[in-house]
A protein has these predicted regions:
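Classical protein tyrosine phosphatase
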Residues: 117-118, 146-166, 374-403
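Non-transmembrane, juxtamembrane loop and terminal tail segments
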Residues: 51-75, 272-290, 442-463
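Reductase modules of NAD(P)H-dependent flavoproteins
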Residues: 2-13, 225, 325, 330-334, ...
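FAD-binding FR-type
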Residues: 284-370, 390, 549-553, 609, ...
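Canonical alpha-helical transmembrane segment with a positive-inside/aromatic-interface signature
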Residues: 247-287
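Extended, low-complexity, polar regulatory segments
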Residues: 1, 35-73, 541-560
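Hydrophobic alpha-helical membrane-embedded segments
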Residues: 31-47, 123-132
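Membrane-embedded alpha-helical bundles of multi-pass integral membrane proteins
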Residues: 13-25, 54-258, 266
């Protein structure tokens, strides 16, 4: 082929590939537009239905179609968070396949390599867009960056596959043409370095991330920077326009970093974090400053230079007056933070935050809020509950059903103050607490065992809620990840015993981290006595409430008690009871945070409750993503 013919061929290929990139951009933008339209249509419909006193025309067919669709899409499917996630990934992969294999000469390795090189660049731009912490999609679609992480990982892997095909085809093409010398040119050396850099990025995400998150983060960021710079040197010609896409990609990433750094520096002066150790590796962080737009349930990236000078870690807001985080110790930063808090309880450290981040339905717009948490996931549900209570108007009939499962009794100490806040909240809403301890062979000092209600309905005077607690829960059989224990206990006659243990003696106004320390100590001191007193018996328990400083208004308000049950909850039944007891003209929010097994039960159960003849049900799952 002559030089002129070759130039004409390259020019024609450039025109075709640029047109294919426009198709790719149109496909991705169309995918985003679907979510934008659906989000704002549902938001507008919900707003009109809340404010309108008369039926909305065509509302019934619209509601029936959307609910039938959501009933299918929010269910858990293997390898994906939900059916909706799987459908989104399938659409994204389909767009890539269509752009890769249309209008291309598949018999020429050079043409195939060029097409996949362009697709690598285009997908890399999309990968970075999905990773932006300050993403516009959080406003346009109500999906913030952590909820986009699933697609970010899929698109990252697909980008790497495109890069490998690009490199393999061009290598085969040059070797077949006996042009090995081209492989040692500086542009190709830059490409080889970029390839290994992106290989390191991919390995860090797939292999290192589940094992050592901090190492993953450092490798991910450093090798991404190396890869993007080397890719620019690989295609430096602005006429080919690839470098323009790469510069745009780098600019997006850099701008997001500048915004985050500026926000952290803005909140740094005169700011500090007070750290308190909690039982079983927990740490409480209390910030001096409360940033604007801080709401319970959202999360901030916390920077404590004394623990890690160059790291910021995301934690969920539990309370905003003051700004408070509850941190579970794993390894790295959280482990060192807990060690420091244990060695210096109540220490004050210079700190700052970046945020808030996270999107979820506004709880104030629902008639019933069902919150389910497992272990440390209660940081989200406590934050959401307090968020709703603080904003409820006088006369509101909103009900909050709070379900929390923990492994140990003293895990409850992590949220002692917040449990007390929900119990004594001067709010028109109703808070129905359901606490479950899965490893609870004995009653802790904060539980006062008392005689179970008899068949005539007589119970412990002065208490409005009781629940049966089986002290043999540690050996109970479990049919599902969250099935109840001791279900057949009432079939057999058992001997009842009553043992009174000292309640918390702190007044409400002095509840602090000392409560957690005292609770942990009393649990250890009382264990032996409680085992002998409760072994083999059935015991109803209530949480002993600390004495309070009462006012006239306090004395008129009935005291709430927290339901406490040993064993795993039957989440499916609890959720169904909460939703099915709601009138069909009302709205229910089901929000959960916890391990994958819990989230699967919540998803599948809630999906079955999304019906045309039932209340409007909204599901929000706050997945562990870090």
């Amino acid at each position: 082929m002559s030089g002129a013919a070759k130039q004409a061929m390259f020019a024609q290929r450039q025109i075709i590939v640029e047109q294919q990139m426009r198709y790719f951009a149109a496909g991705i933008c169309g995918l985003i537009a679907i979510f934008v339209i659906l989000h704002w249509t549902r938001a507008l419909y919900s707003r009109i239905s809340r404010t309108s006193s008369s039926p909305i025309p065509f509302a019934a067919p619209f509601s029936a179609v959307t609910r039938a669709t959501r009933r299918l899409l929010i269910r858990k499917v293997p390898r994906f968070n939900s059916g909706g996630h799987a459908l989104l990934v399938a659409a994204y992969v389909g767009i890539n396949a269509a752009v890769c294999f249309t209008n291309v000469d598949l018999t020429s390795a050079g043409n195939v390599a060029a097409r996949f090189g362009w697709m690598t660049t285009a997908n890399m731009c999309f990968v970075v867009f999905l990773a932006l912490k300050n993403t516009p999609l959080a406003f346009l679609t109500a999906y913030s960056y952590e909820r986009l992480n699933c697609l970010h990982q899929i698109s990252g892997c697909l980008t790497f596959v495109c890069m490998v095909i690009h490199a393999a085809c061009y290598t085969a093409f040059f070797m077949g043409k006996n042009q090995r010398a081209l492989l040692v040119e500086k542009e190709q050396i830059a490409a080889i370095v970029a390839g290994f850099a992106f290989l390191s990025v991919t390995i860090s995400a797939l292999v290192i991330r589940p094992i050592w998150y901090e190492l993953f983060y450092v490798v991910h960021i450093c090798f991404f920077i190396v890869g993007i710079v080397c890719a620019c040197f690989h295609q430096p010609d602005f006429g080919k326009k690839i470098v323009i896409i790469l510069i745009l990609t780098a600019a997006m990433w850099f701008t997001d970093r500048v915004i985050r750094a500026a926000r952290a520096l803005y909140y740094l002066p005169n700011n500090s974090a007070t750290v308190h150790p909690l039982p079983h590796g927990g740490t409480k962080i209390v910030m001096k400053k409360v940033p604007t737009r801080a709401d319970g349930g959202k999360h901030f990236f916390v920077w404590i230079p004394r623990i890690r000078a160059f790291e910021m870690h995301p934690f969920t807001v539990v309370g905003t007056q003051p700004l408070e985080f509850i941190v579970k110790s794993h390894d790295g930063f959280t482990r060192d933070l807990h060690k420091y808090a244990a060695a210096h309880p109540g220490a004050t450290l210079s700190a700052s935050v970046d945020g808030p981040y996270g999107t979820f339905p506004d709880p104030i717009h629902y008639d019933k809020i069902v919150l389910i948490a497992g272990g440390g996931g209660a940081s989200f549900t406590f934050g959401l509950a307090v968020n709703a209570l603080e904003r409820m108007k006088e006369g509101s009939n909103t009900e909050i059903v709070f379900i929390w499962t923990v492994k140990q009794h003293d895990n409850l100490a992590w949220f002692t103050q917040h449990l007390e806040t929900l119990r004594t909240a001067n709010s028109p809403g109703i808070v129905n607490m359901n606490l479950y301890v899965t490893r609870a062979p004995v009653s802790p000092p904060d539980l006062i065992p008392h005689r179970h209600t008899d068949e005539q309905g007589t119970g412990h005077p002065g208490h409005d809620r009781t629940v049966t607690m089986s002290s043999t829960s540690t050996s109970s059989a479990v049919n599902s990840p969250f099935s109840p224990t001791g279900a057949d206990v009432d079939k057999y006659p058992v001997k009842e015993k009553s043992t009174t243990l000292p309640p918390i003696t702190h007044p409400r106004s002095t509840l602090s981290s000392d409560i957690e320390k005292e609770m942990e100590q009393r649990v250890e001191d009382a264990t032996a006595a409680a085992v002998s007193a409760t072994a083999g018996t059935r015991t109803s328990v209530i949480v002993a409430n600390p004495p309070e400083r009462h006012t006239d208004s306090d004395s008129e308000r009935p005291r709430r008690q927290h339901k406490m049950t040993a064993g795993r909850p039957d989440l499916g039944t609890l959720i169904r009871e909460a939703v099915q007891s709601t009138p069909r003209n009302q709205r229910v929010l089901v929000a959960s945070c916890g391990p994958q097994s819990l989230m699967t039960v919540v998803r599948d159960t809630t999906a079955g409750l999304v019906r045309a003849d039932g209340p409007a049900v909204e599901l929000h799952c706050e997945q562990f993503g870090w």
